[in-house]
Structures are given as C-alpha cells and as structure tokens.
C-alpha cells in the first residue's frame, strides 16, 4: 500500500500516458516524444505540476517579461506548456489532485 510518506517530495516525469482514449493521439502529441515534467507534492496537502515539450526553445525577447517576443513565439510557448496546482489526496492507493489554479 502506498503511504503519504512515499509520495511527498519532488518527482520528474519519466513517462506520460493519457486518460482520454477518444483523443489519445492528439493528447500524447501535444508535448512531443520526449516531454519534460515536474511534480511537487507537499506534506501540507498542496501540489504543483508542470509539463512541457521536451527540448522546446526558450522564449525570445527581454527575459524580464518577454512582452517584446513575437506573437508566434509566445503562442508556441503557450501551446507547449501547462502548469497547475491545488490540493491532493491519497486514498486506497489512488492519488487524486484538485485543480485550484
């Protein structure tokens, strides 16, 4: 049985699947063949996850805010990255997240 202590910490993505069989091909293609990801799980019950296209180029422009980056570059960055956070629970070996932001 998985315990809370087993999952608290920082985890790197090693493989990615999909929970949407009707749209599996598009879902898996969104982040490419080598996606990168990070999951942070706190003992206080908070989590944060980020996934992006592996090897994607950095956003161009002024690194302070990138507001001067061309629209196409900003759209590519937006389309190849997702991050979310919220509360998590572990019940009967099932890890569940509640998206708050």
Predicted regions: what they are:
Residues 1-101:
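Lipid interaction determinants
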């Amino acid at each position: 049985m998985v315990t809370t202590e087993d999952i608290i910490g920082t985890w790197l993505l090693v493989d990615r699947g999909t929970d949407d069989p009707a749209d599996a091909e598009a879902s898996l293609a969104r982040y490419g063949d080598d996606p990168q990801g990070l999951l942070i799980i706190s003992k206080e019950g908070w989590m944060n996850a980020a996934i992006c296209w592996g090897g994607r180029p950095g956003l161009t422009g002024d690194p302070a805010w990138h507001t001067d980056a061309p629209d196409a570059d900003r759209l590519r960055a937006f389309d190849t990255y997702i991050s979310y956070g919220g509360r998590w629970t572990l019940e009967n070996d099932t890890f569940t997240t509640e998206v708050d932001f």
